[in-house]
Amino acid sequence: MTTRRNFIKNTAKVAAALSLPVVTANTFGFNILHKDLKPEDTIIGHGDFKFKVDKGWAKMSANTNPILNCHEMVQDSKGRLIMIGDHTHNNIIVFDKSGKILEYWGHSLPGGHGLSISQEGGEDFLVMTDCGYFQDKNGDWKAQTGQVLKTTVDGRLLFSIAHPKTIGVYKPDMKFQPTETAVAPNGDIYVADGYGSDYIIRYDSNGKYIHHFGGHDSSNAAHNLHNAHGIAIDARDKNNPVLICTSREENCFKYFTMEGKFIRKVDMPGMYVCRPVVNGTNIYAGVCWSKDSAGKMFGNSGFVTILDQSNKVVSNPGGTPPEYKGGVLQQVYQAPEKTFYHGHDVCIDEDKSVYVCQWNAAFTAPVKLTRV
């Protein structure tokens, strides 16, 4: 994937070169942005979706619980907030809503990236992806084949899903670097191969292959995916659940039936959107990068975006206000006063607070946005 690969190349030895002092979350990289603005004074967002920024929410030490990239977060049935990252000291960190760490585990996912949660028989289960990117012994970022794992909520492995070439779905030379999963109500697992070959691969609840779609080879370009970074099940219409897939290089979401038939595209101009997160009647997403006025993508330009029931953008916390002309969304930019580096995922709790995970963000912990 071009964007991530370029940024990895440019920052290849940062983590190896930097020593991490013992600090609390209040100085966990958050001092770099907003040096002259107190976190409690910062309100971001638009319309009915405005938030107070709490950059010191996570009560943690970089020495005890180091973070490279804070990738994704979900909330379990007990209200706990579960984060996945790619530091093998603690791939999984579990917080309570006050930001206190309850537990941490996981040492085998150097590319820990995607995290989904499902319930079966009243029990929570996690589905994780290792996207294949890892740091070698010299601190250089490299790529290898990724994997998907289904575990209990405390980390007991149930099964893993390997390279699709092992079952004849991919050709031997095709890459498999999965970035995300979505779990259907019946337990079927949809895997987004966002850093690999851009297919959406469907398995049953036991990891048996069903079918796949997407990729780059459809004669109808609208059906193709380019950096299929995220996927979610949109059940806002309970009688007609559909899949929302990220085509991040195209700055859009694409809708498909649960069987993989293309429905429509929702353009997100200037926004390199990550996984869509459906909450109530809204869709939230992290924006990893945005573009400048010349249409060029640049680093440290992320924010969060929120869409309504009609897939109209209603707020861009950390970005510029949404503007529509003739029913068409105009390009959205990062706000002049930076709040985020690279918005990679969001988790929304029952109070409608938003927890923002960031990639390549100076080792920062999740940032809490409290609805105001």
PLM regions: where:
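Surface-exposed loop and turn segments in beta-propeller and other repeat-based domains
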Residues: 56-64, 158-172, 176, 210-223, ...
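Asp-box/WD-like beta-propeller blade repeats and closely related beta-sheet repeat scaffolds
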Residues: 110, 129-184
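Loop/turn-rich, solvent-exposed surfaces of beta-rich toroidal or solenoidal domains
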Residues: 271-320
